[in-house]
Amino acid sequence: MIAMNRTVDLDASYTFCRQIARSRARNFYYSFLLLSRDQRNAMCAIYAFMRYCDDISEAEGASGSALERWSQDLDRALSGQYPDNPLWPAFHDTVQRYKIPCHYFHEMIDGVSGDLVPRRIQTFDELYRYCYRVASVVGLTIIHIFGFESPDALELAEKCGIAFQLTNILRDVREDSANGRVYIPAEDIAHFGADLAEHDDRFVALLSFEAQRALDYYDQSRPLLSLVAPRSRPSLWALIEIYRRLLSRIQRSNYDVLARRIRVPTWEKLAILARATFS
C-alpha cells in the first residue's frame, strides 16, 4: 500500500485516468470534452474505477475473491490509504471534491459481481435491479460532478441510467449470449416465442418491445437536463443524444444485432458535440 499525497502524484493519477477514458470510453468520453477541466478529470477518474470493475469481473477465471479484494482496496482508498494502483489518488480526490456518496461504488461492485457466472434474467423487475446497480448508480454518481440542487434529479438520473443500460443490452445480445449471459427477461422471450440466436419476426418483435421500454425511460428522464447546473447541460445532452442515436440505429437496422455490433460513428458523435457546443 502506498500513500500518494503530493501534487505531482495526484496529477499523474489524473493523467492515468484520462488515458483509460480516452482509450476505452467510446461514448462517455466525447461528452466529457464539453465540461470544465476539473469536471472532465473527475469524470475520467470515475470512469477508470468503473472500467476496472468491469475488467475484473470479465477477466478469464474471474472470481468473487478478486472483486472482494477490489472492494477492500476501495475502502482503503476512500480512507486515504492508496493501494498500489495509480487510479486511486484521483478517484479519492474526486469523491471528496464532489461529495459523492461512497455507497454508490460498492453498489457498482455488487452489480458486476453478478456477471462472474452465467446468468439468465427471469423478469423485468430482476433486470431493473441489475440495471440500477451497473448503470443507474453511475448516473447518480456523475450528477454530483455535473452539479444539481433539486432532489428530483436523483430519481431522474436513475431512470436515465436504466435507459442507457437497456440500450447497451440490445446492442450486445450476441456478445452476452456467447458469454452465457441473457439479460432480456425470460418472461419476455417466452411471450414472443423468440430465439435469441435467430433473427426472425419474433426476434424483431421482442427487441422492438425492449427498445420501447428504453425509449420510455429516456422520455421519463428528460427533465433531468434542466435540473443539472447550466454549465453541465451541453455535456449531459450530448451523452443522452449519443445513446439515443445508438438506440435509433439499432431500430433502423431492424434489430440486426446478431450480424454485427452497431455503433454511432465518430463523425456523428463529433456532430453531436458541435451541436451541443453552439446550440
Segments the model singles out, each with a brief description of its role:
Residues 1-166, 170, 174-279:
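Catalytic cores of Mg2+-dependent Asp-rich isoprenoid enzymes
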